[in-house]
From Swiss-Prot:
Annotated protein name in UniProt: Homeobox protein OTX2-B
Family of this protein: Belongs to the paired homeobox family. Bicoid subfamily.
Residue ranges of the region described as Disordered: 93-140
MF terms in GO: DNA-binding transcription factor activity, RNA polymerase II-specific; RNA polymerase II cis-regulatory region sequence-specific DNA binding
Gene it is expressed from: otx2-b
Annotated GO biological process: regulation of transcription by RNA polymerase II
Length: 289
C-alpha cells in the first residue's frame, strides 16, 4: 500500500516533467508560426500595375473607395493593397519635396561655407605676413653669434639684446673689452654666473658703470696691451672648447685674475675650484663644490 502511494508521485512527476517539456517545446514552435501567418506578404507590382496606379495618383492623391475598387479590379489586386500603395506613394512624395527643399538650402549654405575658408586663408596669410619680419630678423642674430657662444646656449639670449646694459650680470659689466668683442665674451661668461646661485652683484660694482659708457671704453686699471693679450689667449682657449679656467677666457697658465680700482677696492680670484669676492666693507666667500 505504501509502495503504491509512493509510486504515483514519481509517475506524476515524470508525466509533469514530460508535459512541461512538451509545453516548453510547443510554444517555441507554435507561437512564431502565428505571427508569420498574420504578417502580410510583400506585394510585388508589375510595370503595367504601376502605370495604372501612377495615372490615378496623378489625377488625385486621395482616391475614394470606388476608385480604389475599380483600379483593384483592373490590376487584379485586393482593394487594401491599392489603399496601402497610395498611402506609401503620398509619403514618398512628401519625402521628395522635403529633400528638394533641403537640397535648395544646402546649395545656399555651401556658398557661405566656401567664402569663409577664403577669409580664414586671407587672415592666416595676413598673420603670417605680420610675423614673417621677426623670423627674418632672428636669422642674423643667430648667425652673428660666434662658435663659442653655441657652447653656452643658456646665456645666448640676454647678451644679444645689450651686452653692456646695466641690467646684465656683474661679470658682463666688469670685464674690460671693446663692444664688438664683448658680445662674444659676455655670452661665454654669462653661464658662469650659475655659480653665484642667481645673485646679482650690481651693488658691489656700482662705481664701475660710468666706465663702460662708450662702445670702445675699457676699465681704467687695465691697459690696452693687457686686454689684447688676454683676448688673444682667450680666443685660443675658447676654440679648444675646454671646460675650466681656459674655457672662460683666461690664460691657461694663469691661476687667478685680479681687478683693482681706486674708487672701489675689490678683488676677484677665479679658480677652477673656488671663487672669492673680497671687499673692504664686507668680506665673504663662496665655494663651488
Amino acid at each position: 500500500m505504501m509502495s503504491y502511494l509512493k509510486q504515483p508521485p514519481y509517475a506524476v512527476n515524470g508525466l509533469s516533467l514530460t508535459t512541461s517539456g512538451m509545453d516548453l517545446l510547443h510554444p517555441s514552435v507554435g507561437y512564431p508560426a502565428t505571427p508569420r501567418k498574420q504578417r502580410r506578404e510583400r506585394t510585388t507590382f508589375t510595370r503595367a500595375q504601376l502605370d495604372i496606379l501612377e495615372a490615378l495618383f496623378a489625377k488625385t492623391r486621395y482616391p475614394d473607395i470606388f476608385m480604389r475598387e475599380e483600379v483593384a479590379l483592373k490590376i487584379n489586386l485586393p482593394e487594401s493593397r491599392v489603399q496601402v500603395w497610395f498611402k506609401n506613394r503620398r509619403a514618398k512624395c512628401r519625402q521628395q519635396q522635403q529633400q528638394q527643399q533641403n537640397g535648395g538650402q544646402n546649395k545656399v549654405r555651401p556658398s557661405k561655407k566656401k567664402t569663409s575658408p577664403a577669409r580664414e586663408v586671407s587672415s592666416e596669410s595676413g598673420t603670417s605676413g605680420q610675423f614673417s619680419p621677426p623670423c627674418s630678423t632672428s636669422g642674423p642674430v643667430i648667425s652673428s653669434s660666434t662658435a663659442p657662444v653655441s657652447i653656452w646656449s643658456p646665456a645666448s639670449i640676454s647678451p644679444l639684446s645689450d651686452p653692456l646694459s646695466t641690467s646684465s650680470s656683474c661679470m658682463q659689466r666688469s670685464y674690460p673689452m671693446t663692444y664688438t668683442q664683448a658680445s662674444g665674451y659676455s655670452q661665454g661668461y654669462a653661464s658662469s654666473t650659475s655659480y653665484f646661485g642667481g645673485m646679482d652683484c650690481g651693488s658691489y660694482l656700482t662705481p664701475m658703470h660710468h666706465q663702460l659708457s662708450g662702445p670702445g671704453a675699457t676699465l681704467s686699471p687695465m691697459s690696452t696691451n693687457a686686454v689684447t693679450s688676454h683676448l688673444n689667449q682667450s680666443q685660443a682657449a675658447l676654440s679648444s672648447q675646454a671646460y675650466g679656467a681656459s674655457s672662460l677666457g683666461f690664460n691657461s697658465t694663469a691661476d687667478c685674475l685680479d681687478y683693482k680700482d681706486q674708487t672701489a677696492s675689490w678683488k676677484l680670484n677665479f679658480n677652477a675650484d673656488c671663487l672669492d669676492y673680497k671687499d673692504q666693507t664686507s668680506s665673504w666667500k663662496f665655494q663651488v663644490l
